[in-house]
Amino acid sequence: MRRNCNAGFKSPVQSPSSSSSGRGSEYSLQKEVSELQGKEAALDQEIAQLESEGFSMAELEEHITLLHEYNELKDVGQMLLGRLAVLRGVTTKELYAEFGMNLED
């Protein structure tokens, strides 16, 4: 069976003209904006509550920076363990045991 390569292609993505009327899409955009504004207000309230409890945005940003640094270092460690395992012809699981590391780390 041979298919005609020149047959029409029906895209799964609807074109703006084939979607709902302009009013419907405008309504859905307004609804989405309203939902996002509600989420923003809730987040602002949560931030205010955390600040009233003594937390600061600067402290949070510092923690996030440190977590990124930790994750980068952990990734490098994992890469080194993987290379060492290949060189020794063992699994990384065996290296974890050899170095007294927990697999959950």
UniProtKB/Swiss-Prot annotation:
Signal peptide: none annotated. Residues 1-31 are annotated as: Disordered. It comes from the Eukaryota. One of its GO terms (biological process) is double-strand break repair via homologous recombination. Keywords: Coiled coil, DNA damage, DNA repair, Nucleus. GO terms for cellular component: nucleus; Swi5-Sfr1 complex. The keyword tRNA processing does not apply. Residues 11-28 have a biased composition (Low complexity). Its main location: nucleus. It is found in: Nucleus. It holds the Pfam family Swi5. InterPro entries: DNA-repair_Swi5. Component of the swi5-sfr1 complex, a complex required for double-strand break repair via homologous recombination. Component of the swi5-sfr1 complex. Belongs to the SWI5/SAE3 family. This is DNA repair protein SWI5 homolog. It comes from Xenopus tropicalis (Western clawed frog).
